[in-house]
Amino acid sequence: MRKINTRSIINFDTYPKPPAVAKAVAQAVERYGGNPGRSGHKLSMRVSEKIFTVRQQAAKMFGAQTENVAFTANCTHALNMAIKGVMQYGGHMIISDHEHNAVARPVYALSKTRGVKYSIARTGETDSETVENFRRLITPETKCICCTVASNVTGRLMPYRELAALCKAHGICFIADGAQACGLLKLSLSDGFNFLCTAGHKALYGPTGTGLLISDGEYSLSTIIEGGTGATSALLEQTPFLPEKLESGTINTVGIIGLGEGLTFVRQKTPAVIKAHEEKLCKQLYEQLSDIDKIKFYEADQKKVPILSFNIGDIPSAEIASYLSEKGFALRGGLQCAAVTHTTLGTIEQGTVRFSPSAFSTPQQVTALSRTIKIFAANN
């Protein structure tokens, strides 16, 4: 819990971070002033070693070769790199009906600028039905399936292993959006991902402005950004060496060093323990509110990561979130940057209020939140 303008804020979004993350960020600003991979002086060498260590951490966590881990600005950046790097001109790709705009918008843009066709697969009542819906959309032109591992709106899990097997059987690239799942599920390239994209600031507990593009090395990406890499600098052609090829320009050394401590936190605590803790809090909130008729939960009965999305009658979700903010709770209202998902849920006009606890959330905070929601529901 933190204080803003002397008021306590119980945050159920992307804060707080482990103390070691904040300490690492401060130390990075003070001690690691060099540009990694750009010079031979001690400052540059020291920060290069630090960045390499974090890259190794991420590679070990997700079962990748170290050179196949690229640092990005966020998950959106990583997804754009993967999608646009695979789908250059023409062809067909498939996405799910639970995608974030980080997937939907690049795909839509490619349909307007590169002649890429796309289809949206409907999620079914069962995993097998969902996979079958994807399978039916595959054509001889299909090059890629891009699917979230877990919805950022409701937490619903997609059958990612089965979709990976489907892609492999048809020789199709599989790109996964792991932003809402990495750090909560023990995801690995061994699950069948060709590209796993994720954010550093969510369940990996790193700073904002950090992300990861993790590859199994089967597909070579064309670049969407070219520039200085510190490698083959005498050539105008972008370096072919990884990860430098995908990391043009000065990278976010401060954020990456902080991310390293976030990865350490997750590894030591374990995704399973973190997930179990958050699931208990979601169950607690659901049980405390489920007897109120005017409160509607979305996909609460599905296999999912620990998220609850709800509405109160026909009240705009932004109004509910604003009220909760005034009472000291930070929950996300609106569309959560996921118009495709809200179209699927039938909430494109109202949005939803999203409860997304963390490893630092407590049962006492959830009880206080549920009481506040009950008061609002009773008076509106």
Regions found by a protein language model. Give the residues of each.
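Pyridoxal 5′-phosphate
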Residues: 1-380
